[in-house]
Every structure is written in structure tokens, then in C-alpha cells.
Amino acid sequence: MNLSRALTLTSVSTILSLAIFGCTTSVDQPSNSFVMSNQQSPAFYGTLNPYASESVYFLLTDRFVDGDKTNNHEDQGGKHPSFDVPLNGPDGQQANVGYLGGDFKGVLNNAEYIKNMGFTSVWLTPIYDNPDQAFNGGEKVAFGEYYKDGGKTGYHGYWSNNFYQVDEHLPSKDLSFADLTKQLKEKYQLNFVLDIVGNHGSPSYSMAEDQPKFGEIYDQDGQLIADHQNIHPEKLDPKNPLHAFYNTHTGLAQLSDINENNEAVLDYFEGAYLKWIAQGAHSLRVDTIKEMPHHFWKKLFDRIRQHHPEIFIFGESYSYEAEFIAEHTRPENGGVSVLDFPGRKAITEVFESADSDFSNILSYLHLDDGVYQNPYELMTFYDNHDMERMNATDEGFIDANNWLFTARGIPVVYYGSEINFMTGKPEHKGNRNYLGQQRIEQAKNHVIHHELTNIAHVRKNSVALQRGLQVNLDFKGDVASFYRVYQNNDENQTALVLLNKSDSEAEFNIDEMLSTGLWTDAILGKEYKIDSNNLHLNIKVKGHGATVLLLNSPVNNAELRAQLVAQQGKLHAAISQ
């Protein structure tokens, strides 16, 4: 494709809608943004959404660090104690389903640690009040078992009974939620991701005897507005005001299943989440989004956006089917981003095995096929609290991070992954075990932590890695190479990414679609001059290494420009649909 044809295609693309991803409505686009920037260069970008510059450290608050022992409430629960409830396994293995002391102060005390790794946001599990006892209903959970809640507590925060009140295990006398978000932002430049729940409350039936707070919901004044009364959902009375918040069918385990058709439910959650946004929440993560119909979320998000039109929202739709989770990204369904579960599957399959082929990672990207409203705004990850941690070597984690922080999407890293904590373990085998201050101090000398810090800072300082279009070059065996290109207004940057997941040094010979100019190694600072007399790069990348070369000038390679024009047109045609 010649240059004149490329520019013609770019001109055609100006008739497309300039809305960038309905989940945020966060950026007003210049009317000519797909054609020319400053009347000189065509604009290329995956997204203009400011949130794409974020990288997120996700932690389960109770299991991070105990910064204040006065809020542990170790004697809470009576005959159903809630503190330190171990699940013992073979060979000394252990998990725990009780509270272990992590709190806001533990997070704030280690905010510099999180910031220094290169993260810009911190996502905590839900902050809302949970019941004070271990659940005495359901099937009794044991080490290594799945989908059982008997004997567990709400240490994780997802069994809320008052969404307007912070759980007593989290704040300190001198550190409220508002204090936490303010200090995170002002002292450490860390934004706060609020984990919200709309699908369920706490375990609500099958108890030997009714327990306080279980199956109950309280309002901002502490008044009881909903109560399951330890009754099976099918026996609830919709005409009973205390039952009207709930559906009359079962949901997840014994959790109360919130009635998505009750306007009072929408009013309740709108008020609660607006309260926490006003106190400093910067973005929202939506728990179990697929368990509620699209119309519920659309109404709730529309209400929130009336007050905060630029807020970024991403949901957890636990499915490996891209077409399914992509439904949430459509404007008519609420228009949010999602956690990239298909990406998680591909990433772990590639980096858990030394014999894997890099080409197998490409299937989840969907760069320009219209599957997602905007693939560049998806939240990418390899570990979380609901599934087995990635079962990889230290080198596998290094390779995964090198990919996560250079490929399309917004990276999320789960606490402890920087030291290969509880490798391969699911929830009740240690996935959610307590990290603690000692491990954090040790982490600063860990090889994964070191390499993660390097690549996270590269992304933090590169607009191309944050928002640029991705053009793949070679993915084969243990090596991968690709471009990320951002070109808009006066900001121009191309990143050439070279990844090596083998134990040995790899040599890259790059001449395909290579623009002329002065390229700089983002980590080492070494410069490479490419001109008409030298249209070739020869780079050696260490074993389990990443090299990112940056060119801070407009694209001048006709073949690359043609590919970018074509991809830009397809991407924004999908966005405008």
C-alpha cells in the first residue's frame, strides 16, 4: 500500500464516530484525530483514555499486612470465632478462612513499596461491613476443597451487609477510608480502585440457627432494610418488605441473590458507591458482573456517570470466551471494560511451560476484529484470588510480566506474584495466605521483583506502551517482537518490543517496517541510529529478558504506516458501532 492510499484511508476514517469506549466517556476527541495531528501526521493510537496509563497492584486487604493490631478483633465471633481459622493440609500445608489482621494501615505503610515497583493504582478487596462470625451453614470447607462456605468468614470483604459502612477490621483511629485514599494519592501518587458488589450480599440460609448480620442489609443510618431470615430463597415472600431485596431463586452458594428488578436496590447501591467515590475512589472494579443482567448494570452505571462521567469501570466476568465477556463492553450493556480472562488463559499456558511457543499467545489479543468495544482498554492479568495462582518458575513470572507490561491492555498484578508466592495454589490451598511485612522486605531483593520493577517503569514512562496500537512482527518459539505506536497531536512515539523467554541470549535482526531516526533503549539508554544507509537493527536480548527501543518521532516507514492506518480504521469502526 502506498503512502497516498494510506492517507486516503485515514481520511475516510474521519466519518467514524470518535467515541472512545463507552465505559468511560472520558476524553473529548478532536474532530480530526483520525486524520492528521497538527496537519502533518496521521493519528495512531489504541485508546486515548487516560486510564490506559495506569497499572494496578491488586491485594486482598486482610492478607497483605497487619499494620494495626488494635483493629484485629481476635475475640470476635463467640462460638463461631472469626479470627485465624486454619485449614490444615498434608505435609504442613495450610490455608486460612478467618481474619488475619491486614488493614488500611498495612497498605499505607507499604504504599511506597507499591509505588516503587512502578504501579500507579492499588485495588483492594471490598471495604464494606461484613458479618462478625464464621458462617455455620452450607457445606463445611476443608483444605483444598472448592465451592464450600461453611466455616468461612467475610475476611475477603465480599459478604457485605452494610455497603455504607467500612468493616471494623480495616480502619484505624487515625486512618479512615477517606484518609487512606487521600494519602495514597497525595504522598504516593497512587489511585484507589474500589471493588463494588451488586449481585449478592452475605450467606443467608441453611444456618443451624440464624446468625447476626448474615442475610441482612443495613442502610446508611444503620437501619435494617432487608433480611433473608435464614429462609431458603424459594420460600421468601416478595410482598414482605424485608424479602423484596432478594430473588426467590438460588444464586451463588448460599449467598443472598439481589433482586435486579427492584428500583430500591438501584437507589441503595447508587448512594453507597457515590459515597465512596466522593471519599476518593478513582475507579471501580465490579465483582461477578456476569451474574446480573446487563440492564441492571446499565442503569447503575448511568446513574454513577451522571455524577462522575469520566470514571473508569471494569468488571469481572469469569469466562474464557472472548465473545461472552465482550458483551459487557458494549454501550447498550453498560459499556465497561473487563478483566481479560481469555488473556489470562493464554498467558499462563505460555509462561507456565518452558516448551511453549510464543505464537500461542496471540489468539486472545483481538486487536482489530471488533470482538471487544476496545481491546486496548481491557485489564490484563495472570493471577487473582479466585483461581489457582500461575504455576510457573521465577523465570516464567519474569517473562509473563515482560509481556503484560508491553502488550495491549492495562496490567494488573496480584499481591505476592512479585516473589512467586504460593505458586499454583487455589483459594483453599493457600492462594490467599498472609503475605506480611517480612516477605515484603525480602521481596525487595527478589529477582522477579527486580525485573518487574524495570519493565513496569518502562511502561509507566512510555505513552506507546500505554496507549499505542500494536503491530506484531515475529512470534515464534521463545521470542516475540512487535511495535506499539502512539501518534497524536504533538506526541509521537514508537516502541519496538523484543522479548526472549529462553534461558539463553537471543539475537534479533529487525528490518521489517523499521522507521528511520534515533532509537533509544528504554532501560539501558543505549542509542541506535537508523538511516537510509542502515535500515537494520541487530539486538541481543538476555535470557528471560525484554528490550524496549523508543523512537520519539512520527512514523516514516510506509509499510508500517499502511498497517497502522488499516488497523486504526478497523478499531474505530468497531468502536463506532
PLM region spans:
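A generic structural motif
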Residues: 312-318, 415, 521-525
